[in-house]
Amino acid sequence: MKIAAFGEVMLRFTPPEYLMLEQTEQLRMNFVGTGVNLLANLAHFQLETALITKLPANRLGEAGKAALRKLGISDQWVGEKGDHIGSFFAEMGYGIRPTQVTYQNRHQSAFGISEAKDYDFEAFLAEVDMVHICGISLSLTEKTRDAALILAQKAHAYQKKVCFDF
């Protein structure tokens, strides 16, 4: 069974050792996202996985694709658009101090500016058995919401299983 997801790949920056941003000059960098997390776990159990999304047409996009491949996620359906990636800083909580997350430029990310016409949903659906549509695609921008709904409709027409997270 091949399971795929439609959603955003983001770049997470995290200070080391529960430090706050103003307490460090170092950050850890990870490519993350709901779809990435889901597919990486399924790939760990030897299921075939793929992500359909957009990444920037630059070194960040290349690094994002490499990160997906390391996790066992096919990047065959990862296209390029624009030059930004959604990113956020996650300052991990400690004791009674809660975790704080600060997002950057998410609406202008490669995924955020993508629209249904940027994807070959028919060819994609011909190769997968199940599609997970990440909740962020429904709420990030009108274009991503429309693309998610079109993908769901086409998946239904192709008799593919569809699941969502909200």
Residue map of PLM features:
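Amphipathic, non-transmembrane alpha-helical secondary structure
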Residues: 40, 118-122, 126, 146-149, ...
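Conserved N-terminal subdomain of the carbohydrate kinase-like
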Residues: 48-135
